[in-house]
Amino acid sequence: MEFDPAKINTSSIDHVTILQYIDEPNDIRLPVCIIRNINNITYFINITKINPDLANQFRAWKKRIAGRDYMTNLSRDTGIQQSKLTETIRNCQKNRNIYGLYIHYNLVINVVIDWITDVIVQSILRGLVNWYIANNTYNPNTPNSTTISELDIIKILDKYEDVYRVSKEKECGICYEVVYSKRLENDRYFGLLDSCNHIFCITCINIWHRTRRETGASDNCPICRTRFRNITMSKFYKLVN
């Protein structure tokens, strides 16, 4: 099932954005609550509202060696203290629509999403998170934001155009399909490894990552076998600064 942004209802309570993905014909109602941190740099997602079992699984995973190592590496890579990678909004009458455990979006996309057994919900969740981030990366009303000149805008557009031109020709190193030509829109994203520059579509590298984890194997690049820690979902073949 292809992700459809037209099926998103957006609302907010206090500092929490609530995305409701509603697909009545397919009996799908997926709520995703998102908090942007005070610097508007990163995002935290409520996994309790997606499924209460996910919060319990996450707490158990965080206590295991793999979880502790992942949290340590994520804290180092993001510069965020481990204690700040999660946030809890308590359950009370005022917060009944937004309470729960919020965790850094990297943990959702690279860890928690693999615990969801329904592949349709997986796909929709990934699409929702990506859609929200893509539409909220720059907010001209953010306090202390820097004014961008017309010349700066032209330079930015030129840079993105160059990266897009290269990206649209790139093939996944696993399925050998051109990433931008894949049938499903949600598959037309790159999965960037933090250890090397090999090219993969997000779907193939996530399947590889999940399979390696299930078999107890190391998280190694399928091509060069260099060990990686994180997978970043990106519309381009490389990160654009």
UniProtKB/Swiss-Prot annotation:
Its main location: host cell. SUPFAM superfamilies: RING/U-box. A zinc finger (RING-type) spans 172-225. InterPro entries: E3_ubiquitin-prot_ligase_p28, KilA/APSES_HTH, KilA_N, MKRN-like, Znf_RING, Znf_RING/FYVE/PHD, Znf_RING_CS. Residues 21-131 form the KilA-N domain. RING-finger E3 ubiquitin ligase which catalyzes the formation of both 'Lys-48'- and 'Lys-63'-linked polyubiquitin chains. Plays an important role in virulence by acting as an anti-apoptotic factor. The RING-type zinc finger domain is required for E3 ligase activity. This is Host range factor p28. It comes from Ectromelia virus (strain Moscow). The gene is OPG021.
